[in-house]
Amino acid sequence: MANKIASPIQMMVSPGPKPNGLQASKEGLWVIDQGDSRVHLLDWSNGKVLREIHTDTDRSSGITIDDEGNIWIASTYNCKIYKISQDSGKTIEIYDSPGAGINATRELIEGSERTGDHGLEWKDGNLYIASPPSQYIHEMDTKNWAELNRTKVPGFRVHGIAWAEEEGNMWVADTAMGVVSRIRLKDSRIYDVFRVPETVEVHGMTIKDNVLWYCDDRRPIGTLIVDMNPDF
């Protein structure tokens, strides 16, 4: 059985120095930058900057949009989740990161810094949060910030997440291992997996027309061309 390996195709270059989170929308591609904490909305066809929003977040790693158009950002290095008005760019609310902690490789090192969450997705009023320290996806009720469910993810360093076409399934990227898996959230069952060439690091991830988009924190943004049906 051959390994399933995606073919990355660079489509544009991020306007920020360190893109770390993506969210697809009809208006364009939303990008949060870990280097300058700015949000950019980019044109799908050419990467032109359609909007730029300055945020008060701290080295962020995930972004999504809710049903009312508000922007949610995983502010990784102060272990918070920000809800931001798309219209004004002002912070509406700040929540604690549900998965904040110390990454597994650093937990025995004295003085290791706590960090927060990464990839975000939205569905039916709930926020789904991928956390490298906890190695879970946390489903949060945004009305009272209560955890409804948590899903153990495969791998070591979960980052970008994106809804799959299959109901209840999500694509999950592990940056350190260079793999993307399709898992069922209710029980962590894995239904598909593919590798990414070592020249590419998948940090942020989103999906448009059943094609996965990625950002590498060295500025490339592109697509992962791969058969979305398991062949093993």
Predicted regions and their residues:
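Short loop/turn segments immediately following the C-termini of beta-strands
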Residues: 34, 76, 132-133, 175, ...
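Blade-level signature of beta-propeller repeat domains, shared across WD40, Kelch, NHL, RCC1
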Residues: 201-232
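A short beta-strand motif characteristic of beta-propeller blades
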Residues: 7-13, 48-53, 90-95, 100-110, ...
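Short loop/turn segments that connect beta-strands within beta-propeller blades
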Residues: 43-47, 85-89, 141-145, 184-188, ...
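Conserved beta-propeller blade signature
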Residues: 28-31, 70-73, 126-129, 169-172, ...
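Blade/loop signatures of beta-propeller domains
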Residues: 1-5
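Beta-rich, blade/repeat-based domains predominating
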Residues: 13-26, 56-67, 99-124, 153-168, ...
